[in-house]
Amino acid sequence: MGRRIQGQRRGRGTSTFRAPSHRYKAELSHKRTEDTDVLAGEVIDVEHDPARSAPVARVAFEDDDQRLVLASEGVGVGDTIEIGISATIEEGNTLPLAEIPEGVPVCNVESHPGDGGKFARAGGVNADLVTHERDATIVELPSGETKRLSPDCRATIGVVAGGGRTEKPFVKAGNKHHKMKARGTKWPRVRGVAMNAVDHPFGGGGRQHPGRPKSVSRDAAPGRKVGDIASKRTGRGGNE
């Protein structure tokens, strides 16, 4: 009898397949303020968060509240950032889209007013504020997609810190291992045809090939459910 395939092991939910969320710092969201207020805070530290690709800044606000915020490029220890409708247009400050001029790069953009920020949060990325309309603000996301958002949605001025992260090579497999482990991703990913016959339905043989049709029923047993699951068609094929 063969061993359990990786999909069956993943379903059991051991630590190998779970993200170490107990090490994550916090869910970063915009601080809530009154509409007429401008709240200032001093950056007292810049920290690493295993949950994300960008550094986070620990900010002590005037109301004696300390929280972690997504760090923008150019923001460092000792700098002051502002949150509010009347905040100045400077890197690291957070204010509604309606108060931000066109063409200014922004990050951590809210999808709906008050949700804390959903778009442009990865290291080194930013969204661009394209134009203002009467009842909407057009924002171009890092993917190139444009979004019509409420003018009351808040965003942070600038580019998320940590740019150039992907340009540095891992060099060693150990470095890649630690990176993937921090995200709960099983790595390395071994191909089924490279396994032994006992480990995978496509394993074994004198050369690497599935050895059977890859199409499999939707109702197949868990240990057999690999390949093209319930495929309507396979192969290259053209439009008919």
Swiss-Prot record:
GO cellular component, one term: cytosolic large ribosomal subunit
InterPro entries named among the record's database cross-references: NA-bd_OB-fold, Rib_uL2_dom2, Ribosomal_uL2, Ribosomal_uL2_arc_euk, Ribosomal_uL2_C, Ribosomal_uL2_CS, Ribosomal_uL2_dom3, Ribosomal_uL2_RNA-bd_dom
Keywords for the protein's UniProt record, in alphabetical order: Ribonucleoprotein, Ribosomal protein, RNA-binding, rRNA-binding
Superkingdom per UniProt: Archaea
MF annotations from Gene Ontology: RNA binding; rRNA binding; structural constituent of ribosome
Pfam entry (one): Ribosomal_L2_C
Region ranges (Disordered): 199-240
A biological process term (GO) from this entry: cytoplasmic translation
Compositionally biased intervals (Basic and acidic residues): 221-231
Function: One of the primary rRNA binding proteins. Required for association of the 30S and 50S subunits to form the 70S ribosome, for tRNA binding and peptide bond formation. It has been suggested to have peptidyltransferase activity; this is somewhat controversial. Makes several contacts with the 16S rRNA in the 70S ribosome.
NCBIfam families in alphabetical order: PRK09612.1 (NF007180)
Similarity annotation: Belongs to the universal ribosomal protein uL2 family.
Complex formation: Part of the 50S ribosomal subunit. Forms a bridge to the 30S subunit in the 70S ribosome.
Protein name: Large ribosomal subunit protein uL2
Designated gene of the protein: rpl2
